[in-house]
């Protein structure tokens, strides 16, 4: 079972005591009025998010496991609650090469670990999600913690060392009346390398196990949630979910969540026997791009079916901090729970748990297809190989930063 870490000075912090063995999964518990979040240093993983419904009944709305062995499985990898990297999402053909304006190679790798067919997914077989992170600090009031790890040169085939940090914090928002989970991810490198970290929590706002009927209550899965995404375009992908470089206007398509819409009423049609159905698509967030891309937004507004545009920016613009803005919000009618997601990333991947297939989760819950959904804020998939997309290549002396806020309400 998960074990709460009792308050102790960091530096005297033990991940697992000898009598508990290597399979112990301890968690840091963060608390603020209206919210409790459990974080495991293994994978910097969010294992629980407890928030009340409209009647004040508290439930855990994050899918996950009770034991370390399940989180560390090499066979079954849903990435429940983990920070994924060094590069989230897919890198086509597990290779990349980046050249500067003079044609000189900035960085390259032909030896990334291919763990999704021929492609590299979420950093490889043992990405950031399958390593212990050090607990660098925890606030005395129990509302914040900071986790760090150093990914060595050539880990999963990536060039150079990458020092990463994740800070989680919780607070009550007196202005909105909601309860907030703040996440900030940062990284530096000693050699030019793509960096694109994402937080991979699966949500079910009716409760993590609500997708299985209990005989009294109707099952509630991802399809029952009402979703709005502030994106008028979505990245077109091939059959292996690699972007083609084209952004499609969502108007009149299953991807149009510009107004609140039930996920189940919007599922794209299944076109192939090997298509699992559901969403696994990256949305281009409105207002995320610099003025150069304004023409693309204008083209989409005119109703163009597909807009082949460049979202590439130079290094200075890439490192310029964006403001937080609302990217998406989800509402679950039975519980009355609403979640608003703010971020500073250019895109958000909507994934509806298409490959969940009966994983045994916390408290005996069984997670079938569409048991939960992810809203993974990030750079575009395969952007390191897509010259029309904003680059995620980080150089020595630069700092990568990715911020998001999840605010929970009951109404």
For each feature predicted by the language model, list its residue ranges.
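An exposed, glycine/acidic-rich loop-and-rim segment of catalytic or binding clefts
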Residues: 2-411
């Amino acid at each position: 079972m998960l074990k709460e870490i009792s308050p102790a000075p960091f530096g005297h912090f033990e991940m697992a005591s000898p009598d508990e063995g290597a399979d112990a999964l301890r968690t840091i518990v963060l608390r603020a009025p209206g919210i409790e979040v459990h974080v495991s240093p293994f994978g910097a993983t969010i294992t629980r998010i407890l928030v009340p419904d409209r009647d004040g009944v508290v439930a855990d709305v994050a899918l996950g496991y009770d034991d370390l062995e399940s989180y560390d499985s090499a066979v079954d990898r849903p990435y429940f609650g983990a920070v994924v990297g060094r590069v989230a999402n897919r890198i086509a053909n597990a290779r990349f090469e980046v050249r500067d304006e003079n044609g000189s190679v900035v960085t390259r790798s032909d030896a990334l670990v291919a763990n999704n067919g021929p492609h590299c997914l979420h950093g490889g077989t043992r990405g950031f999600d399958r390593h212990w992170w050090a607990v660098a600090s925890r606030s005395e009031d129990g509302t914040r913690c900071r986790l760090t790890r150093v990914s060595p040169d050539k880990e999963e085939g990536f060039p150079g060392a990458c020092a990463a940090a994740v800070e989680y914090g919780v607070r009550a928002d007196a202005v909105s009346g909601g309860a907030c989970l703040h996440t900030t991810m940062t990284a530096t490198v000693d050699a030019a390398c793509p960096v694109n970290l994402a937080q991979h929590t699966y949500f079910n706002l009716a409760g993590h196990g609500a997708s299985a009927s209990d005989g009294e209550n109707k099952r509630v899965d991802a399809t029952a949630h009402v979703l709005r995404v502030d994106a008028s375009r979505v990245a077109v992908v091939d059959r292996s979910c690699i972007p083609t470089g084209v952004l499609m206007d969502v108007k009149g398509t299953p991807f149009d969540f510009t107004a609140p819409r039930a996920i189940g009423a919007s599922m794209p049609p299944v076109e192939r026997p090997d298509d699992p159905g559901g969403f696994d698509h990256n949305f281009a967030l409105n207002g995320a791009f610099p003025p150069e891309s304004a023409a693309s937004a204008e083209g989409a507004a005119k109703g163009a079916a597909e807009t082949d545009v460049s979202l590439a920016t130079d290094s200075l613009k890439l490192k310029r901090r964006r403001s937080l803005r609302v990217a998406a919000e989800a509402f679950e009618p039975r519980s009355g729970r609403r979640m608003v997601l703010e971020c500073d990333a250019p895109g958000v991947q909507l994934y509806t748990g298409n490959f969940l297939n009966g994983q045994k989760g916390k408290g005996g819950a069984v997670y079938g297809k569409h048991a939960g959904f992810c809203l993974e804020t990030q750079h575009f998939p395969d952007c390191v190989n897509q010259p029309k997309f904003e680059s995620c290549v980080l150089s020595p002396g630069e700092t990568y930063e990715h911020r998001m806020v999840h605010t929970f309400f009951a109404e």
